[in-house]
């Protein structure tokens, strides 16, 4: 089994979209998940969902308000495991306001 520690940024839009997807032969452990409001004048909420392929979906946060120029650690030191074909989905109140930073371990 190979282990790769990596990360990515994701621009959250007003349409629900996967910011991270576990491949068919992958297990992903999300070890860091921050969302930031980068807009200069407008507060915005964000919803973060864990979509389980063949399991029970869950929300990490539902319409959590992020003030202008502020950020939130969605995991508070915890971890989330994505099994094959699971996704980490995001949607925001306003376009071009919320950015996510995701750090994770991929095991194949």
Predicted features by range, described:
Residues 71-79:
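Exposed aromatic-hydrophobic patches
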Residues 64-72:
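Short proline/glycine- and polar residue-rich coil/turn motifs
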Residues 37, 52, 104-106:
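Beta-strand elements of well-folded, non-transmembrane domains
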Residues 37-45, 94-98:
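Extended, low-complexity, turn-rich repeat/linker tracts enriched in Gly/Pro/Ser/Thr and Asp/Glu
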Residues 63, 79-80:
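Short, surface-exposed secondary-structure edge patches
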Residues 40-63:
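Short, surface-exposed beta-strand/strand-loop-strand elements in extracellular ectodomains
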Residues 80-94:
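Noncatalytic modules at the cell exterior or secretory-pathway interfaces
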Residues 1-28, 32, 91-108:
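C-terminal interaction-tip segments
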